[in-house]
Amino acid sequence: MNKVNFQSEGETLVGNLFLPTSNIQDEKLPAVVVGGSWITVKEQMANLYAERLAEQGFAALAFDFRGYGESSGEPRQYESAKNKTQDFKNALTFLQSQPMVDPDRIGGLAICASAGYMARAVAGDGRFKSFVTIAGWFQHPDTTPESYGGAEGVRRRVDLANAAMNKFRSSGQMDYVPAYDPNNENAAMFFEVDYYADPKRGAIPQWENQFAVASWSEWLQLNGIDGVAEKITVPVLFIHSDNSALPDNVRRFHRLVKGSKDLYWSSEGTQTDYYDQEPYVGKAAQIAAVHFRNTLA
């Protein structure tokens, strides 16, 4: 694994570039940009999948989005679909500049919320040649209120977000709540999620259990399906399960994609099982590698 950095709209993003150990000298590699769940850092699920893809012969880049982990950017822990979409595009630009990478054979793999962000990048940037989502979370106005206390819960959080952003712009100070706290209804994740509670899983030292309140505005008003799925023309593979997040939204996105598409559906595994648990990660990574091998040839 090589520690790398690159620029994204004036910010320095820090990443881990995983390479195959058996690469033939001077052979140009297919490459994959990898993104994890919302409010996470590269050392969580992104690193894990990038390492697995490298074992399968790909150059794979996991990185911290602006405002997260080792990357620069303010406010910290600010969840922005717009920013993350652009960061994915700039990660691809970085991979294209690497001498061991074939600049015309680069795809994207996204876990959870990154699926919606990366989909926007893939739809708007023809340099992405293939796309895989794993336990993808595709936000849509029809379903968002179900997770946040209905329309009133959404409005309340958006109002808080707008006030927090106005405060940040005038004072440079951001309001924060916990990213995860099942005992705090104001937390970003106010329900039980073992992954973020367990130091052996997601509650690692590199991860800040913090959420910029201003994030609610973009997150809760995001439509990650309509006007996005229809624009994707590269081969897409959706890996999902009955017990992963928003299964009907994944099916909806899949239906709207007009190009080559595949859906691998399992009756086993929860959303967070696909973050770091076996056999789910191993199986998903293997299926993704086959897809990339066939579509980045």
Predicted regions and their residues:
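N-terminal cap/lid segment of alpha/beta-hydrolase-fold proteins
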Residues: 1-27
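Short beta-strand element of the alpha/beta-hydrolase
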Residues: 27-37
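The serine-hydrolase catalytic nucleophile loop
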Residues: 38-51, 65
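Catalytic nucleophile-loop/oxyanion-hole region of alpha/beta-hydrolase
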Residues: 42, 68-103, 278-283
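Conserved alpha/beta-hydrolase
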Residues: 52-72
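Alpha/beta-hydrolase-fold enzymes
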Residues: 119-199
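Short beta-strand/loop motif that positions the catalytic acidic residue
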Residues: 231-232, 238-240
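Catalytic active-site module of serine/aspartate enzymes centered on a nucleophile-bearing elbow/loop
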Residues: 267-269, 273-297
